[in-house]
Amino acid sequence: MTFPSRLTPTNAIDALPRLRGRTPMAPSALVLSVLIPVYNERATIELILDQVHAVPVRKEIICVDDFSTDGTRELLQRMKDAGRIDKLIFHDLNRGKGAAIRTALAASTGNVVIVQDADLEYDPADWPTLLEPILDGRADAVFGSRFLGGPHRVLYFWHSVGNLCLTTFSNMLTNLNLTDMETCYKAIRGDVARALRLTSDRFGFEPEITARLSRAKLRIFEVPISYSGRTYAEGKKIGWKDGVAAIGHILRFNLLA
């Protein structure tokens, strides 16, 4: 069986390696686009926005509601009207987390972008650590690893095993040595992120963006972050079916896409 070549990127991606080696970015020049995919997070969305606003960087806050049904949409609109959200986009049907991120990314203008989940599992106080290698000119993308020693809530053993297996499988195909491919926290240069032509709708976003960054031969750093995972009773959405699907996504985006 012959697979399509992995070395046939789009014109936009093909141009990215030539952008490496830039001079450092002055912190005063930073505009951080914060991409917040939201689905039925009425209990936490105000709290996460408080944490986002507390980080002293110039930022563009973009929320995409993926057809919430618990009152989140109305709450988001009130916060937009109050000036707490810069851009608010509503999906007219539930399309998935990846689709919400892609919608937010298309609306972004910042020279660095980061995805921020709305569920309080990831702490915006870790942003400075994620941004430092990009501002120093050492990295094009920085992954925040939950397994490099940062404080974390102790929860599910099998989730950790599953994450290790998926990260290892992804590393085998990308030839990277990441410890946490599935992390939400990926700070990426804005020009890079917007050129990647992402297609995933659900939780395939993480394997896809990792594969595309690797294929473009960009500089990836990994730094430790804190993590406060939720239980399913508290609203955690990802399950074992998403883990199984991730295997297919890793194969697809490294061998076929």
Mark where each language-model region is.
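A conserved acidic beta->alpha catalytic loop
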Residues: 65-74, 120
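Short, well-formed alpha-helical segments that are part of the catalytic scaffolds
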Residues: 17-20, 41-54
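Hydrophobic helical membrane-anchoring modules
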Residues: 1-31, 173-176, 198-257
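Short beta-strand/loop segment that forms part of the nucleotide-sugar
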Residues: 49, 53, 58-68, 89-91
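Conserved donor nucleotide-binding strand/loop of the catalytic core
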Residues: 59-62, 73-107
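Acceptor/aglycone-binding surface of glycosyltransferases and processive sugar-polymer synthases
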Residues: 91-107, 112, 124-203, 229-240, ...
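Acidic helix N-cap motif at the loop->helix transition within catalytic regions
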Residues: 43-47, 70-79
